[in-house]
Amino acid sequence: VPKQFLEINGKPILIQAQILELLQQMKLKSGVAVLLITHNLGIVAKAADRLVVMYGGEVVEQGSSMDIFYRARHPYTWALINAVPRIDVKLEEELTTIEGTPPDLIQPPTGCVFHPRCPYCMEICRKRKPQVTADGEHISFCWLNHSMAPKVEIPIRQERE
């Protein structure tokens, strides 16, 4: 049960950075766990040891920060990473977005909750919830990770020259 709750969204960036630094120091000194709930992947990359990626109220991927950022296995995670603004691209380039609209949580779609927006959607995605696949502590819920699924190239942007 959390002993403290601290809201940092909406605060100036420098204040957010100072709060995160203070939380990191507290974590190291006292060994307490810090739970961050955020959509800001910059904060996540800097502060989190482990990540749980959720979409439509469901876990779609979970693992270490390194696994999620460098070996993501779910199309929603790929889309999130690709949507992060980068300083090494021209300002004229449009930001990457995730096509479609978020699911209706009152009447969620059958099958995989991400399938209506997923560019890799297969028939099974529309009908059945994905089974968990695990690689050590890195887990994901996506039919693309099934041994019988077609292989796809992971579309995470590479560093540009």
What positions do the PLM features span?
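N-terminal glycine-rich phosphate-binding loop and ensuing alpha1 helix
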Residues: 1-21
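P-loop NTP-binding/switch modules centered on Walker-like glycine-rich loops
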Residues: 19-93
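Charged, flexible cofactor/metal-binding loops and thiol motifs
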Residues: 65-160
